[in-house]
Amino acid sequence: MTDESSSSISYPPIKKYKKSLKLNNNTNNNNKNNNNHNNRDIVMQPNSTDEESSDNEKIGFSDPENEKINKHKASFKDSNDENNNNSTYYEDTDDDDYEDEDEDENHKIKDESDNSEDFNNHTKNTTDLDEGFKSTVNGSESEEEEEEEEYEEEEEEDEEGKFNLDQYDEFYEDDDDGDDDDDDDENAQDKVEILQIEHQNLDNDNDNDNDYANDNIYTKAKEALHLSAVPDKLPGREKEKATIASFIRAKLKANESGGCLYIAGMPGTGKTATVKEIIKELQAKKKQQGGGGGLNFQFIEINGMQLSDPHQLYHILYNKMQKTRKSLEPKKISSQDALRLIQRNFELKNKKKQFRVILVDEFDSLITKKQTVIYNLFEWPNKPNSKLIIIAIANTMNLPDTLLPRVKSRMGLQKVPFTPYNIEQLETIIKYRLQDLDAFDEESIQICSKRVAAVCGDARRALEICRKAATIANQEYQKKLLIFNNSNNNKSLSGSQKLPIPGPITADHIEEVFEQFSSPLLKKLNQLSFYEKLFLLCICRENQFSNVPEVKYGTISTRMRIITKKINVSCPNPTQLFQLAGNLLGCKFIIIQDDKPINWDHQIKLNLPLEDLSFGLEQDPDLKNLEISNN
């Protein structure tokens, strides 16, 4: 520890936050912000015009694990709820007490002295954060064990003869013809876009209808850069595409057992898009060959984030598997019954059985304590007559290290990593989207690619930034048109002016986009203490160094000691460091990744885009003048 008198820089003490007394209202506020539960790749929103909107919406916090944060909300106070700081709320009483409304109102009013006393008691005992966190986490862990026990009890009941597999014999009888099946399969796949990405649209910029009515170079560029636009090919992933395609073709030609393929990479690196592009090419080739050439297969896609419970995968998979037969209608059966039907299908030897390629996106969301679901997924392809390929996609690079040994043994060693896009790849992607549109100058594309590649290498992020820049340029052009029209309508003016010509989108437009994103975040960061900002900076540095979204608590502590020693300031002790984590969790800057008591191996994840936080910390007055960029 460095003495404060000898420190070249001194900073205020670490902030402490009191426990939240607003149980009901904080829950409602969290639910309002949970509009995009299925999306992990939330991007920053521009400045909102609604002054009453929450700070979480202004900085574009994602709530993919909102349920886990809600479990801790009783222990940590959301320090950003400034509008309700002077109000205290309590849980509603029973409906029978409605007649005593006047008495209830009196009970809801507390003395200011009582509130301040509660706050002082909380701030004096910093270890309460540790105890409160552990108690809530242990409670959530017991709930998960109860759910697993209930699932096992239902399985035992079904094994007592309440379910008859014979009534579903038609599920295992596949048509040898397969023409109708192929048509249904192709029609279904035509509806699936290669680049189907669930995201929050950054283009929430109050565009006028006139922007889209005027068919100019800016609107065309925005359409070409939209995430839903389907390019004819995906540049920058040629090597990964060849590896995946070779694996699928080899298994299809064998036409017996299948295999497992694990694809890992940060969000926005083209994992799902690459697989879908390969499937589309194989289906087109199958159509040309009339279903021959060993390419007759059914493609099934399941997103783990769309399942309310991991065991729901069995029911969804069963219904999608039987859709190839028109005579079979989806049947309402339990997940346990669906599991038995699926297992029997993969075990039976049937030459007419169709090969299946199952893509499981957001695979890491299916992990439970016993890991039964993912064990079954990796076990099925290993059966001799399964005719099944499982392609598991996850955002976690070190997922195999978190799996149980029995699951690892079934998973195999087939892994395809997707590293973040570099500058050249991002430039190629943007230019390929624009094709012959001369909307951006060369410098603007280079700056956008460099800024994104330096932080996350997310192609979706780069495309959205360019779209936003096109919107800004279009708004400027519309203003020039308005002035031009008003001038021509003014008869007092002599002569006529030339019609404005759309100019190129420049680097200034790109920089303006980054400033719009960082403005609300900077306000949020200003409310944090110096050490809380350092804590976030440590997470950012580890994310950029390891390309893994989760960071171990012990790693953050080590990096904190290195940084504080370099800039000659005191390093927080373990208790203070844990309090920093609790404060940032209460402010929803970070997410606790699993339901276990915190320790040195505990995983912590940012709750907002890495590139936005990195840019905001670079602009922060407390950090930008310190030599910590290379730590």
From Swiss-Prot:
UniProt name for this protein: Origin recognition complex subunit 1
Family: Belongs to the ORC1 family.
Record localization: Nucleus
Binding of ATP, residues: 230, 265-273, 362, 395, 460
Protein's gene: orcA
Region entry Disordered, spans: 1-164
Main localization of the protein described in the UniProt heading: nucleus
Biased composition (Acidic residues): 91-104, 141-160
TM region(s), chain numbering: none
Biological-process GO terms, alphabetical: DNA replication initiation; mitotic DNA replication checkpoint signaling
Compositional bias of kind Basic and acidic residues: 55-80, 105-133
Phylogenetic classification of the source organism: Eukaryota, Amoebozoa, Evosea, Eumycetozoa, Dictyostelia
Entry GO CC: nuclear origin of replication recognition complex; nucleus
UniProt keywords, alphabetically: ATP-binding, DNA replication, DNA-binding, Magnesium, Metal-binding, Nucleotide-binding, Nucleus
Function text: Component of the origin recognition complex (ORC) that binds origins of replication. DNA-binding is ATP-dependent, however specific DNA sequences that define origins of replication have not been identified so far. ORC is required to assemble the pre-replication complex necessary to initiate DNA replication.
Chain positions recorded as Mg(2+) binding sites: 361-362
Pfam family, one: AAA
Coiled-coil spans in chain: none
Bias type Low complexity, positions: 1-14, 22-37
Subunit note: ORC is composed of six subunits.
GO molecular function: ATP binding; ATP hydrolysis activity; DNA replication origin binding; metal ion binding
